[in-house]
C-alpha cells in the first residue's frame, strides 16, 4: 500500500476526523498510486494518521479509516453499511411501514466519503462520487444486496 506524507502541521484537521486530505497538504508520496487505490496517510513525522482512497484533484484522499489495522475489504463494507442501516432503523427511517424510501448512506456523514446509497423499496441505487468508490462499487454492492 502506498504512503502519503503530509506537510508539517497539515494533520490537524485529520486529528479532528476531517474526511478529506487536500492536495496542497501533501508533501510527497512513496511511489505513484493509481486513482482509487487505498493509501495510508502519515504525518511529517512519519506517524500513521488515516487511510483512504487516493484521487488526482484538489481532494487528494477521501478518508475511510483512522485505524491502521482496519483492512478495506468486504468485511469493512459490510460493517460500515450495517452501521448506517442500524442508525436509520433506530430512528424509524428504515423498516418503516409508511415509508420504504430513504438514503442509506450520506457520504461523509456516514464516514464513507464519495458514496451515496438510496433505498427505494427493495432497490438500492448507488452513486460513486470518487474514483475509489467507483472501483469498489461491486464489493459495496455485494455487501448491500443481502439486505435489500
What are these model-predicted stretches?
Residues 1-147:
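RNA-binding accessory domains that recognize and position tRNA/RNA substrates
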